[in-house]
Amino acid sequence: MPTHAPAPGSGDPLGLHGVVPPVVTAFDADESLDADTTADHARMVVDAGVHGVFPLGTNGEFPLLTPSERDRVVTAVVDEVGGEVPVIAGVGAPSTRQTVAHAEHAASVGADGVVVVTPFYYPLDGTAAVEHYRRVAAAVDCPVYVYHIPSKTGNELSLETLAALAEIDTLAGVKDSSKDVPWLGQAVDAHPELTFLAGSDSLLAPGLDVGCAGLVSAVANVAPELVVGLYEAYDEGDRERARARQSTVYEVRAALKRGPYMAGVKAALGLRGFDAGPLRSPLRGLDDDDRAALEADLADLGLL
């Protein structure tokens, strides 16, 4: 358990903390699912020292997968690294019915917890959001974590709604990607029973400063050793070294943002010797110029 870094929530049975990458979903050249390589990526980051894995987050391209493909991803990752670190599986969908189905499957194959993104496309009020999470929590016998990313879902959770969600017995934490530091700080202060996970590479060390126990980092998909080093420095009480690592994370994050949305992570993995295949359409990869620039950036940062 952490020494100087924030502790997980008192009501979190998994005690989630540390670095929890939102692992990638690998595809073959024709964009068909490559479950084996998906599992290999989870293995890669676990062997690098991360503290948990989160399949089927944004980096896992979950909205672009069929329901059966999503189930295969969770099974593959649990089979590969389950029992070594917590596996918290993304199960969110626009409908409560589909979310429950994904959650039931994840729990049945051994996922340690489920991550439920707020439903998207249709706007929801707080009452609907709370009922959604209640129904998911009632369907599975494992902890449930809220994934709060209003920039993608269009649905922001108020602090009042979060307070109502916290009354759900098995709701154990929040992965916050809102980048709203005042909201996050107030949420952490109000709910010591919940584990909070900082969900943006722009706010890893700052997230720890406001009380987040864990870090869900896209950069950790590419350079897990960098983000693990940041967390370990912080937990050892070496804030100066942790902030220096955060500065490097900022530079890596900027490099990964070259070109089309989310193309940088898989391209960087390929440059570092791990081929996760293409993004699934309509997402597209880097062109030759952007790939060359990314390669130069990573080399300058000592990652190649």
UniProtKB/Swiss-Prot annotation:
<feature type="active site" description="Charge relay system">
    <location>
        <position position="121"/>
    </location>
</feature>
<comment type="similarity">
    <text>Belongs to the DapA family.</text>
</comment>
<feature type="active site" description="Proton donor">
    <location>
        <position position="147"/>
    </location>
</feature>
<dbReference type="GO" id="GO:0008840">
    <property type="term" value="F:4-hydroxy-tetrahydrodipicolinate synthase activity"/>
</dbReference>
<feature type="active site" description="Charge relay system">
    <location>
        <position position="58"/>
    </location>
</feature>
<dbReference type="InterPro" id="IPR002220">
    <property type="entry name" value="DapA-like"/>
</dbReference>
<dbReference type="InterPro" id="IPR020625">
    <property type="entry name" value="Schiff_base-form_aldolases_AS"/>
</dbReference>
<keyword id="KW-0704">Schiff base</keyword>
<feature type="active site" description="Schiff-base intermediate with substrate">
    <location>
        <position position="175"/>
    </location>
</feature>
<dbReference type="Pfam" id="PF00701">
    <property type="entry name" value="DHDPS"/>
</dbReference>
<dbReference type="GO" id="GO:0005737">
    <property type="term" value="C:cytoplasm"/>
</dbReference>
<comment type="subunit">
    <text>Homotetramer.</text>
</comment>
<dbReference type="GO" id="GO:0008675">
    <property type="term" value="F:2-dehydro-3-deoxy-phosphogluconate aldolase activity"/>
</dbReference>
<dbReference type="GO" id="GO:0044281">
    <property type="term" value="P:small molecule metabolic process"/>
</dbReference>
<keyword id="KW-0963">Cytoplasm</keyword>
<dbReference type="InterPro" id="IPR013785">
    <property type="entry name" value="Aldolase_TIM"/>
</dbReference>
<protein>
    <recommendedName>
        <fullName>Uncharacterized DapA-like lyase VNG_0444G</fullName>
        <ecNumber>4.-.-.-</ecNumber>
    </recommendedName>
</protein>
<keyword id="KW-0456">Lyase</keyword>
